[in-house]
């Protein structure tokens, strides 16, 4: 049995599930590693709606699949500050708005003592319940009928049908999800 008490413990456990290439984006994105776990929420993306719902529900640790701060590296690297563009021009209004939104989100997270853990690479590669399998199940594909595969994707055999019928079926199967329904609470 795992003794997971802090955000750091949880992050370590998540990263032990499947070996991924380094460097990885799977890490604590925001908040203190020593934060004791009260309640855990999971989501596809930590939007402000999801964060507000988490605070309302008493969640203090959020595991998200996609970036919290809108760039793949989540507050790391040249893309955040647009340093590549600063060589030729000043910040645009769009860039300034983007940076303001990031600061507002960080203030909300800090004010509410939230910890954000990104679990992207592990979940993309986890073979028994990772993103590929979870999406296939939600789309009602036969997860035992894989015709091609690697560690990032699977190709499933399906019955021949028109593109419109397949699209309608997939849309119906995905319709139940919204930012409110995609949160799982412990």
Model-derived segments and spans:
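Hydrophobic structural segments
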Residues: 1-186
């Amino acid at each position: 049995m795992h003794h997971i008490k802090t955000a750091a413990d949880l992050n370590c456990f998540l990263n032990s599930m499947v070996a991924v290439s380094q460097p990885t984006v799977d890490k604590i994105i925001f908040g203190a590693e020593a934060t004791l776990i009260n309640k855990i929420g999971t989501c596809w993306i930590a939007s402000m709606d999801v964060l507000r719902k988490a605070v309302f529900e008493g969640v203090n640790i959020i595991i998200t699949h996609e970036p919290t701060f809108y760039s793949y590296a989540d507050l790391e690297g040249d893309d955040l500050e647009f340093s590549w563009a600063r060589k030729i021009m000043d910040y645009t209004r769009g860039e300034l708005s983007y940076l303001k939104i990031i600061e507002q989100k960080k203030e909300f997270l800090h004010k509410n003592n939230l910890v954000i853990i990104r679990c992207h690479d592990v979940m993309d590669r986890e073979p028994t319940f990772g993103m590929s399998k979870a999406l296939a199940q939600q789309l009602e594909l036969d997860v035992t009928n894989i015709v091609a595969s690697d560690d990032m994707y699977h190709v499933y055999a399906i019955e021949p049908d028109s593109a419109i019928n397949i699209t309608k079926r997939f849309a119906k199967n995905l319709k139940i999800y919204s930012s409110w329904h995609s949160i799982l609470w412990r």
